[in-house]
């Protein structure tokens, strides 16, 4: 059954009647290879992968029955390959958006999810950020140990929020599109929607909508705030920082201090703090 009557126009038709890809105990070699390729396709956002980039050791463990699909997904998400494609050159909030898409098959529901993962990464690091998705009850309930993650955001399931359907189309730009080949680049897609707790209208994939290339970057330019002014209705966050070392700052280690920023500038401010050599102690709602 089609996900919507407009499945062909929205680029979701390939998923409409697709069966879940699961690694069974009696799987043939061809079926195991299909699982491996499906994991690469989904977790790497349909981006091209060269033979030299494949995780040969993890693939071998999976073929020999010494690794579950879940652990293979973890290996891919923690690999240098994944970091090069989605972590090193992306805004941190964009990285979190993609983790939700790649590892849980949906878009973030609200900004509290983004803030939670920003804080988790700052305090516990990259591996803990990845583990938080794969070790979650949500992952276990939907994919278990041997089902390849898929796009749940196009379906209606218990526990899902309907706002996730619209937002999924800000992250998914068509079956043949990859997450590194989109016109908006490495910038976050959902910053404004999450900050205002609203969902935008659905825009068809880039190949099906001639006006797509002219879309304004509404998620990048603040609409309510100018300069240092914070609109009354904007949510703001408190970032506690310590240890800034940069020209213009005292050479003695600074004690902790806090700054207040609107949600839509959170990622930008975090990058600025890192460039100044600062360490983020916590991120909390102000």
UniProtKB/Swiss-Prot annotation:
Gene name linked to the record: cpcC
Name of protein: Phycobilisome 32.1 kDa linker polypeptide, phycocyanin-associated, rod
Source organism (scientific name): Mastigocladus laminosus
Any Gene Ontology CC annotation: phycobilisome
Pfam families, per database record: CpcD, PBS_linker_poly
Coiled coil: none
CpcD-like domain boundaries: 234-286
Domain named PBS-linker: residues: 2-180
Swiss-Prot/TrEMBL keywords: Antenna complex, Membrane, Photosynthesis, Phycobilisome, Thylakoid
Topology relative to the membrane: Peripheral membrane protein
């Amino acid at each position: 059954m089609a996900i919507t009557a407009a499945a062909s126009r929205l680029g979701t038709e390939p998923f409409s009647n697709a069966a879940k890809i699961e690694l069974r105990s009696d799987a043939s070699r061809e079926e195991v290879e299909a699982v491996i390729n499906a994991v690469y396709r989904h977790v790497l956002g349909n981006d091209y992968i060269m033979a030299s980039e494949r995780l040969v050791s993890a693939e071998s463990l999976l073929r020999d029955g010494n690794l579950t699909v879940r652990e293979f997904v973890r290996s891919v998400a923690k690999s240098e390959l994944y970091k090069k494609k989605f972590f090193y050159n992306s805004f941190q909030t964009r990285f979190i958006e993609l983790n939700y898409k790649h590892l849980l098959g949906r878009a973030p529901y609200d900004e509290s999810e983004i803030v939670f993962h920003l804080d988790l990464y700052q305090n516990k690091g990259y591996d803990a950020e990845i583990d938080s998705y794969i070790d979650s009850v949500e992952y276990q309930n939907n994919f278990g140990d041997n089902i390849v993650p898929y796009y749940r955001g196009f379906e209606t399931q218990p526990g899902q929020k309907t706002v996730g359907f619209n937002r999924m189309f800000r992250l998914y730009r068509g079956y043949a599109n990859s997450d590194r080949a989109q016109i908006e680049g490495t910038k976050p897609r959902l910053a404004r929607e999450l900050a205002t707790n609203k969902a935008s209208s659905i825009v068809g994939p880039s190949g099906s909508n001639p006006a797509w290339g002219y879309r304004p970057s509404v998620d990048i330019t603040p609409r309510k705030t100018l300069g240092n002014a914070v609109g009354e209705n904007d949510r703001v966050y408190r970032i506690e920082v310590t240890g800034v070392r940069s020209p213009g700052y005292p050479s003695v280690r600074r004690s902790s201090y806090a700054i207040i920023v609107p949600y839509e500038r959170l990622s930008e401010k975090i990058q600025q703090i890192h460039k100044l050599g600062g360490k983020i102690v916590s991120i909390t709602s102000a």
